[in-house]
């Protein structure tokens, strides 16, 4: 009885503190937006710093990266400026979007008008596949009505979204969505390779699809893949099997990254494989989703029982803005430091849902321009991300599918400073030891010059060749200071076989640009599908 009283008092106190906290954040976000719009005019307002880590290739690799380019496309008249380092398997994307394009985009941002016409530089007659698309700008042809339901938009493209509920082994019911053509009139579709998309922190899988015909989800479907969109536990609508939880309501929020890797990822993958009849699938993940993927691959020997090993279920693992090591922003931002100091106290954040006020506001306001605008300015204030590279007419749509329910315990896993807790911020090197080999192969088919035989191994036993591990494809934004992508690059180029991975390092992208940039199809979508590995030709 006493514990229940204390719990209710903590909930009340934390509600008061968090309401004040969010009010202060809201005011600061509005003020920053006002100052930026009216007093700080910049052609390129982005934070162009990278993390503090420098990329350090193995000393034995002497060749300088070779420069090459790809032509302009339907989404941009700026040819891609690429620098290829074959020894380290890295493509350096040095492309800089023209100032004229960014200036016209910035003016739209300042006006806050998500429906304004963008001043176009694109000449579709110059694009190599201009005849394939009748629109000079696909984004301008999109429906700008704000509806928090992907099915509304995708019906316009001739795609149905099937919704499934998948139950995890520990009793959580998670949502899984599936693209299915509405135009085949009952004719069986050609068998497609399954691809599962997994979202980042405080997002749903709608983030992969909210840009409509300019989204990665749509592009993958149109490219011939069987697209599944996975959500983690609780998500937009929290659901549980209380019988499996022993009717213990405290267990509803007693979970963190470990349970998401052990149960959510396993349940989603098994459901897709059982539904499609394939033995393996490709996993495309963003941010937190990449943390789940890498944890399951690197530490699967410890996390999974013998009936499931993630490393044996994936043909490809595509990591967008991978969150493996913490970036400098976690220490630089006062708001994040303050949150980290209080995250372990139930008097500040409670013990259940993380800042439930966010979901209350979403329930009341989602589908309005003001909700999407406030979501954007808060992201902008907290992380210095902006919409310079996004299609402005789609910006409001992109915020329709966040935030989502997460647990306080999950945020403790991300931010806790306590020495007795293993957190991403303080213990990433223990979860992902960067001086050990994660994917060891007995037959070294690495031609990069690395002497991997002398490296210490982590948990995965040696396999005969790189084909027995998933093919790992990473797109790392240089301007992403939330995570340390450069440290992850250093790990792979110095401690993993060249044949296991492929990296793109994109100079002008930030954390969310890998999903929503106007040219994301050219800079991520196309190279992704060109490098996916399949045992049998499709």
UniProtKB/Swiss-Prot annotation:
It comes from the Eukaryota. The active site is at residues 287, 480, 511. Residues 60-70 have a biased composition (Basic residues). Residues 42-87 are annotated as: Disordered. The keyword Transmembrane helix applies. Keywords: Cell membrane, Hydrolase, Lipid degradation, Lipid metabolism, Membrane, Phosphoprotein, Signal-anchor, Transmembrane, Transmembrane helix. Its main location: membrane. Residues 33-538 are lumenal. The chain crosses the membrane at residues 12-32. InterPro entries: AB_hydrolase_fold (IPR029058), AB_hydrolase_lipase (IPR006693). Residues 1-11 are cytoplasmic. It is found in: Cell membrane. Its EC number is 3.1.1.13. Not glycosylated. One of its GO terms (biological process) is lipid catabolic process. It catalyses: a sterol ester + H2O = a sterol + a fatty acid + H(+). The modification Phosphoserine is found at residues 73, 107. This is Sterol esterase 2. The lineage of its organism: Eukaryota, Fungi, Dikarya, Ascomycota, Saccharomycotina.
